[in-house]
Amino acid sequence: MKQESKQKKNVGTSVMGNDIETTQNTMHVLDENKVLKKSYEDVVYISQPFGATSLNTLAARALLFGLNPVSLKKARVLELGCSFGGNIISQALYYPEASFTGIDLSSSQIKMGNELIASMGLTNIHLIEKDILDIDESFGTFDYIIVHGIWSWVPDVVKDKILSICNKNLSDNGVAYVSYNTYPGWKRLEQYREIMQYAEQKELEMPLMERTLYTKNILKLVADTMGLDNRISQK
């Protein structure tokens, strides 16, 4: 009996430990999201149409793989991390009977996008300030889910949530598009990113926009220096 009681205690301790670890991980992600949200408020990301995510491209690829995608005319479309909607506003214009929903952490970018949508008189697209982690089955199902420029920049818990959304919020014949960065193509851009991160280490007290401009100038200096080296080597 004592041994059994001890085993139960150990199991209970293990479960408690897992719960604590899960809570800590969740708190860490929430803190990260707060930092991300502030950065998105401070610096507006360029949002424009991305050809690979156009509905006709997604439907064509689905057909090539033997799938039976939903008709584009009345499709329900969700974009995660939509910024101010530059990628789906143009599609909402082209498919007036389809419905488009975009979500993003940034309230300022969502506000900007909705103002643009209202000025264009569009009624088939809505942008919502929302955390990806807060989406569940009650959010509805969609025929096309677009996740571009997010996967490679978020922690694992958000990646897991994206996959969950593509599982639970995708219609029976739905298509999900998830882009991600890979080597060797992204190695050079990663090097630029590392130069910028190194350059900003001593300037962390500066506002984000000022740090961004500062590090971009560092990149320009590096580029100019490399150009000088090339000219010297040619002589």
Segments the model singles out, each with a brief description of its role:
Residues 84-97:
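Conserved SAM-binding loop of SAM-dependent methyltransferases across substrates and taxa
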Residues 99-104:
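Conserved SAM-binding motif I beta-strand of class I
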Residues 106-108:
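Conserved SAM/SAH-binding beta-strand->alpha-helix loop
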Residues 177-202, 215-229:
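Conserved class I S-adenosyl-L-methionine
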